[in-house]
From Swiss-Prot:
Domain named Globin: residues: 2-142
Record's keyword terms, sorted: Heme, Iron, Metal-binding, Oxygen transport, Transport
Domain of life: Eukaryota
Keyword Coiled coil: no
Secretion signal span: none
GO MF term list: heme binding; iron ion binding; oxygen binding; oxygen carrier activity
The keyword Transport is annotated on this UniProt entry: yes
GO BP annotation list: cellular oxidant detoxification; hydrogen peroxide catabolic process; oxygen transport
Family affiliation: Belongs to the globin family.
Stated name of the protein: Hemoglobin subunit theta-1
Gene responsible for this protein: HBQ1
GO (cellular component) term, any one: haptoglobin-hemoglobin complex
InterPro entries (alphabetical): Globin (IPR000971), Globin-like_sf (IPR009050), Globin/Proto (IPR012292), Hemoglobin_a-typ (IPR002338), Hemoglobin_oxygen_transport (IPR050056), Hemoglobin_pi (IPR002339)
Amino acid sequence: MALSAEDRALVRALWKKLGSNVGVYTTEALERTFLAFPATKTYFSHLDLSPGSSQVRAHGQKVADALSLAVERLDDLPHALSALSHLHACQLRVDPASFQLLGHCLLVTLARHYPGDFSPALQASLDKFLSHVISALVSEYR
């Protein structure tokens, strides 16, 4: 399902509103993912996964940077995320289902922090956006 002009506008507007806090929200989403889906911790056994740890915050910022790049390059997600796709598929060997779990937790996190903005239309647009990001990230798995 392609992102419509309205989807793109809604995603970009929210991302602009998030501003420099994107990393805060992606870190919270990671913490939610680890708590709700403990199997996702498997790929991070070398990190301190306690809530608020500097290592979780650092990885949360990496997720934020990747998603911000995706927002900037909505028209070319596969190319924009190709290096990350290769890294996760070929080197880290992350289960592709983990991306969907993190995406779900990010939606929950954003809805919690922006309840007045989180309309059904925004939720649908973000869900489509995250689906496209996940599709680009798992492209190297095929």
